[in-house]
Design a protein with these regions (language model features):
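N-terminal alpha-helical membrane-insertion module
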Residues: 1-70
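A general structural signal for well-ordered secondary-structure junctions
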Residues: 33, 109-112, 159
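Cytosolic juxtamembrane segments of membrane proteins
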Residues: 60-90
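An N-terminal amphipathic alpha-helical segment
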Residues: 66-75, 93-130
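Short low-complexity stretches enriched in small and charged residues
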Residues: 84-94, 129-134
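Short, surface-exposed ligand-recognition loops at beta-strand->loop->(often short) alpha-helix junctions
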Residues: 90-97, 138-144
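Cytosol-/stroma-facing membrane-proximal "stalk/adaptor" domains immediately downstream
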Residues: 122-186
Length: 186
């Protein structure tokens, strides 16, 4: 629940309220509330502004996940799939794109400007297995580079996960993280 709340917005609301309270208290000569409003309100407001400026919004599920896939996720999803899903569906601060460290480590875009941008997230069933599908906008990194790194991605995302890469549209890459039957046995 808390992962869906923007700390920047909370800071702006609380800081704005306290700062406004400080100005009103100053106008009515209430020194105690005036000090509280200024000493706490202005820093919280500035902190909220700073967080809002560096905020990376959660990636939406498009379309929303059906209940059958949610129960499949609970049964078959690997720890890595769950971690990726949880990381990209919450607010992040101080980074330019979701999964930036993972993409850099895998060699998909060396500079921040080259890193693909994650657009949407889907969960579905593929051949009875849970699949987490990430759709990237990848204008700087062609499909060939993604395909060269496919084996490295399979190792990176851990045992029990098969990686499939497909180009949907020009500059649009679909990365599917699919559980394998080894996950059920192991």
């Amino acid at each position: 629940m808390l992962r869906k709340i923007s700390l920047g917005t909370v800071g702006l609301i609380v800081g704005g309220f306290l700062t406004t309270m400080g100005f009103i208290s100053y106008a009515v000569h209430n020194a105690t509330l005036n000090l509280i409003g200024f000493f706490y309100g202005i820093p919280v407001l500035l902190g909220g502004l700073a967080l809002k400026a560096n905020e990376l919004k959660p990636i939406p599920f498009v379309p929303p996940t059906p209940e059958s896939v949610v129960s499949l996720r609970e049964q078959k999803a690997t720890d890595t799939q769950n971690q990726v899903r949880q990381d990209i569906t919450r607010y992040r601060y101080g980074i330019d794109v979701h999964l930036d460290k993972a993409l850099s480590h895998l060699g998909i875009g060396q500079l921040d400007e080259e890193l693909p941008e994650l657009l949407t997230l889907r969960e579905m069933e593929i051949d009875g297995n849970y699949a987490l599908i990430l759709d990237f906008d990848s204008p700087q990194v062609p499909l060939e580079v993604w395909e060269e790194k496919q084996q490295k991605m399979t190792g990176f995302f851990g045992p029990g996960v098969d990686v499939k890469i497909e180009q949907k549209e020009d500059e649009q890459i679909e990365l599917a993280l699919i559980t394998t039957s080894e996950t059920e046995e192991g």
